């Protein structure tokens, strides 16, 4: 996995995926052993195959290829490299959520999103959720750059980003926010509660 053990605990998204993978593999009779980013990777030599969970740089992908094991990626689009992968249709999820907000009468919609890096600190391109959010609302004439905050995918970052938006926008705070992860939503909700901003009456998440 691209995370360390400590980092995974602050991102329930990847923790849930890993637990699901392990449960299904065990039900199928496979023995699973976990290797986190800061573990000894030489253990991979003992495996029959590799499930790589997370975001990886070209250099790290080459390192994984060098073991000569069957290799599949989860949450990384590696088809262009000739590797099988399982990914989420993030774009469709964003559009579905934004359409719901519009149906509920929201015209001012904000975004909290993380900027991901690979385990070896290689920056990734703009998050597809952020890109889709911007394109969709721009087409509707509703996109506001000041309603968008980019940080890390963690509860603490969600808290800090919402704190900054509350301070900067005051009464102009959007009536709805799309949260790019559960961890961000948890942190943002804590900030809103501390400021006694009613959810979902004043702000919907």
Language model: regions and residue ranges:
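Alpha-helix/helix-capping structural signal
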Residues: 55-56, 183
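Bacterial carbohydrate/catabolite-sensing allosteric modules
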Residues: 2-3, 15-32, 49, 65-73, ...
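N-terminal helix-turn-helix/winged-helix DNA-binding helices
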Residues: 1-9
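Conserved catalytic/binding loops enriched for acidic/polar residues
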Residues: 12
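Short, well-ordered secondary-structure micro-motifs within conserved domains or adaptor modules
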Residues: 42-55
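Short, charged/polar "capping" segments at the starts of alpha-helices
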Residues: 58-60
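Short acidic low-complexity segments
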Residues: 35-43
